[in-house]
């Protein structure tokens, strides 16, 4: 059921939320991806202007709480490359299989997530999306499709994806190379018909978003929600190591974030409030594990 009002106060990095402990900024990380330098910049901003913690959200974003100078935080985020589009910063909600291209999955969807983010920022109509609207890209393993994103694709094979609405298979099949266009088409249609709805599941008939698309497979399939984050020592398909660490209560001390950044490896935040370090050789992974585990991160 849609809400009677359309007051979308969903916070971003520029439109912050006044919480009991001060201003709260939510930083979108499409696909959960960020660099070591970006994590370090976030940790420094949280230390200098906030509560010296970073909160991990169920949408693989990060939050800074208790902000005393919102302008300074926004400037720090922009300098770190975390605000590529001030107009679209609240709508860059993209969940993607965090281990894709490195461990398991039907195919590597990292480029797909990046292309979706880039195309989303270029579309002036999509600035009207609610801040709660979420895209999903599942590389076939079923980790993201079970999270009930508003519109998503689930890879079936190297050439085909299933189109999902509110976490449910519509029966519509789309060529993999058309997936971004299809996701954006559905999102545009949502802005046209949503009324006061913030999420696809609030529409009286989500199938209206399909337009002329006809299902070619039985619709209705859902995927179970994944509750266990990818943690521990994970051998990548290329022989290198990924380390997965659960963050207790989803609250990451800024000092611990700085230690994570010091590993100088690609990172991802997951929807299960964990962090992944990628592309490590065994020696570096072993040292990182020995340093990070005593700091309160959970690797098992």
Could you describe each region identified by the protein language model?
Residues 1-16, 38, 228-234, 243:
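Intrinsically disordered, low-complexity polar/charged tails and linkers
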Residues 180-183, 187-193, 240-242:
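A conserved active-site cap/scaffold subdomain adjacent to cofactor or substrate pockets
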Residues 2-3, 19-164, 169, 173-181, ...:
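Small-residue-enriched alpha-helical segments and adjacent helix-cap loops
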Residues 211-250:
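Accessory "access/gating" subregions that flank catalytic or transport cores
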Residues 53-56, 126-130, 191-210, 216-227, ...:
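Flexible, glycine/charged-enriched surface loops at secondary-structure junctions
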């Amino acid at each position: 059921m849609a809400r009677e009002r359309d007051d979308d106060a969903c916070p971003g990095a520029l439109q912050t939320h006044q919480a009991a402990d001060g201003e709260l900024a939510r930083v979108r990380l499409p696909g959960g991806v960020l660099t070591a330098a970006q994590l370090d910049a976030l940790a420094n901003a949280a230390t200098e202007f906030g509560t010296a913690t970073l909160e991990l959200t169920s949408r693989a974003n990060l939050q800074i709480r208790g902000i005393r100078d919102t302008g300074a935080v926004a400037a720090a985020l922009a300098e770190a490359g975390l605000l590529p589009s001030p107009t679209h910063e609240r709508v860059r909600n993209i969940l993607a299989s965090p281990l894709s291209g490195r461990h398991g999955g039907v195919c590597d969807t990292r480029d797909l997530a990046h292309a979706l983010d880039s195309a989303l920022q270029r579309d002036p109509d999509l600035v009207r999306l609610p801040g709660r609207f979420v895209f999903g890209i599942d590389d076939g393993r079923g980790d993201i499709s079970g999270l009930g994103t508003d519109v998503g694709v689930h890879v079936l094979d190297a050439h085909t994806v299933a189109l999902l609405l509110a976490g449910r298979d519509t029966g519509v099949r789309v060529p993999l190379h058309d997936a971004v266009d299809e996701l954006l088409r559905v999102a545009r249609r949502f802005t046209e018909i949503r009324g006061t709805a913030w999420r696809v599941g609030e529409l009286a008939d989500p199938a209206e978003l399909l337009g002329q698309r006809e299902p070619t497979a039985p619709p209705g399939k859902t995927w179970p929600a994944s509750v266990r984050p990818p943690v521990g020592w994970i051998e990548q398909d290329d022989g290198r190591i990924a380390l997965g660490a659960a963050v207790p209560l989803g609250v990451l001390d800024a000092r611990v974030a700085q230690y994570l950044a010091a590993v100088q490896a690609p990172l991802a935040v997951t929807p299960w409030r964990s962090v992944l370090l990628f592309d490590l050789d065994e020696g570096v992974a072993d040292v990182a594990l020995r340093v990070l585990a005593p700091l309160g991160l959970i690797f098992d």
